[in-house]
Amino acid sequence: LLALAGFRGDPMLLPVSALLSGIGLMVQVRMGVFDGPERDPVDLLLLPGSVLLLLAVALAGMRGRYRLLAGRGSGRAALWVWALISVGLLAVLLATGQRFRGAVYGLGFLTPTELLKLSVVLYVAVYIQARLKALSRWKGLLPPLRVLAPLLAFWALLCAMLLLQRDLGMVLILNLALLVMLGLGTRHPGWWAYGGLLAAGAGYLLLGVFSHGQRRVEAWLAPFQDPTGAGWQVLQGLSGMYSGGLWGEGFSEARPRYTPIAESDFIYAVIAEELGFAGSALLLLLFLILLARLFTIAARARTPFGMLLATGIATVLSVQTLLNVGGVTKAIPLTGLTLPFISSGGSSLLTVFVSLGLVLAISDGEPPRPKSSGSRSKAGAAARRSPGVPATGVKGRRTGSHPGSRRSKPG
């Protein structure tokens, strides 16, 4: 479909995404996610539906049409739209959600916060691109606080609503995305310095206030102190990866049922157990290729909004992948985040594919500008004024000569 529509964007993004999705589907089938009488038949349509949605978004946003998401002028209307969607998702979740294993889910165990990632990235991209010059002008060591005030007010409300749900992982993802978008968008080093200081201070305060985060840090530092309780999931995942060795125990030969939430949070441990270090390393290589392409597309984007939007999406996927794999391998504390493409979850899959559709549209670039007739007429006029100089020559340099241009040597 993209080829028929004249797509001129990145040729690697879609194949790598298809490989990751295929691996995820294969692992979910092996885990028996689609088995059982209680399983919703709609789950079988999630992957093909997500692929069609990706293609639809990419086709709709081609030739620079993705810029319609930023609105017109200052983008004030678009800012209100994305802000209301973001706050509305969290408000509905707080009002109707149900708590399960430390997270708050919507009806049918949907996760509206997955859609929140995209709406917040769109809000930040619109906000920064409309105020790019102002955000780049600092007064000494102070950022432009007056320009930042609306963004900070929205951000405080957003983080407060997420903390009411004890969703520390989402708070971390969104704050890192904001920092990277500000840093790369304005190219001012001050954002990185302030962001690092604020992240360290906020992390210390949050761990001191929320017992949920404290227990996860304790289970990370000393899982054997409570091997049948808080440390059970980490220890089972590590045991499975250790038993997988280099080549694994074979596909469908492992016993991941002993690991809690193996089909979601700990799906990477299942892959490492069955396919070994080689299989899990190949999976990480595919993720690395995908994320590298996302950041490359962001760097080559022809508009500030396209660059910021692609940067935000790439950062969200990068941080989420890092937090999931890092938590499973005990490199960092568990965050309860899923692994994109691989873990079970319809909301996550839909959001990832819509995001990739937008990045594909950004990679397609702007429509080619036709040559104006005015420029051709000017070139023709210049040629008539100087008959000995071709019209296609470089400005300020003669590309040809006429008989009177050379000086004759003295006889």
What function would you assign to each model-found segment?
Residues 1-166, 325-339, 344, 348-354, ...:
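Membrane-helix boundary/helix-loop-helix interface segments in multi-pass membrane proteins
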Residues 25-33, 89-98, 183-193, 203-213, ...:
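Juxtamembrane membrane-interface segments at transmembrane alpha-helix termini
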Residues 49-53, 273-294:
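Hydrophobic alpha-helical transmembrane segments
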Residues 99-109, 183, 191-283, 301-309:
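Hydrophobic, glycine- and aromatic-enriched re-entrant/interface helices and adjoining loop segments
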Residues 123, 208-212, 289-293, 317-320, ...:
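Transmembrane alpha-helix boundary/anchor motif
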Residues 145-208, 220-221:
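Hydrophobic alpha-helical segments of polytopic membrane proteins
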Residues 164, 168, 172, 248, ...:
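Hydrophobic alpha-helical segments of membrane proteins
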Residues 295-336, 342:
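Loop-to-helix entry and N-terminal half of a specific, functionally important transmembrane alpha helix
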